[in-house]
Amino acid sequence: MPLSKEQKQEVMEKYKLHEHDTGSPEVQIAILTEKIKQLNEHLKTHQQDHASRRGLLKMVGKRRGLLNYLKSNSADRYLELIKKLGLRK
C-alpha cells in the first residue's frame, strides 16, 4: 500500500520550496499525510490489522515531530502548511 511514484511526485510538486526539493519538512510532512490517509482507509475495512495500525501510529509520531521542528524554526511556514493540509494545530 505504499504511495505510487506518480502520487509521490504529485505531492512533491505541490509542496516543494524550490525546483529540486524532495526533503524539506513541508514535502516530508505532505508525503506522510498522504500515507496516513491511505492507511486510514485500509484500516476502515481491516480493523484487525494490528501491524498496519502500529505503522500508522509510527507515521503519525514522525509527522508530529517534523511539525514540531517546522513550528520551532519557522512558525509562518508551519501555519501555512497545516492550513493547506487541513491538519489541527
Curated annotation (Swiss-Prot):
* SMART domains from the UniProt entry: Ribosomal_S15
Q: Which GO terms describe its biological process?
A: translation
Enumerate the residue ranges of region (Disordered). Answer: 1-22
Please list the GO terms describing molecular function. rRNA binding; structural constituent of ribosome
Q: Which UniProt keywords apply?
A: Ribonucleoprotein, Ribosomal protein, RNA-binding, rRNA-binding
Q: Which CDD domains match?
A: Ribosomal_S15p_S13e
**Is RNA-binding among this UniProt entry's keywords?**
yes
PROSITE patterns for this protein: RIBOSOMAL_S15
**What InterPro entries does the record tag this protein with?**
Ribosomal_uS15, Ribosomal_uS15_bac-type, uS15_NS1_RNA-bd_sf
Q: Superkingdom of this entry's organism?
A: Bacteria
- A GO-annotated cellular component: cytosolic small ribosomal subunit
HAMAP family, per this entry? Ribosomal_uS15_B
This molecule's function is given as: One of the primary rRNA binding proteins, it binds directly to 16S rRNA where it helps nucleate assembly of the platform of the 30S subunit by binding and bridging several RNA helices of the 16S rRNA. Forms an intersubunit bridge (bridge B4) with the 23S rRNA of the 50S subunit in the ribosome.
Family, according to the entry, reads as follows:
Belongs to the universal ribosomal protein uS15 family.
What quaternary arrangement does the UniProt entry report?
Part of the 30S ribosomal subunit. Forms a bridge to the 50S subunit in the 70S ribosome, contacting the 23S rRNA.
| Protein name (Swiss-Prot/TrEMBL) | Small ribosomal subunit protein uS15
Which species does the entry assign this protein to? Natranaerobius thermophilus (strain ATCC BAA-1301 / DSM 18059 / JW/NM-WN-LF)
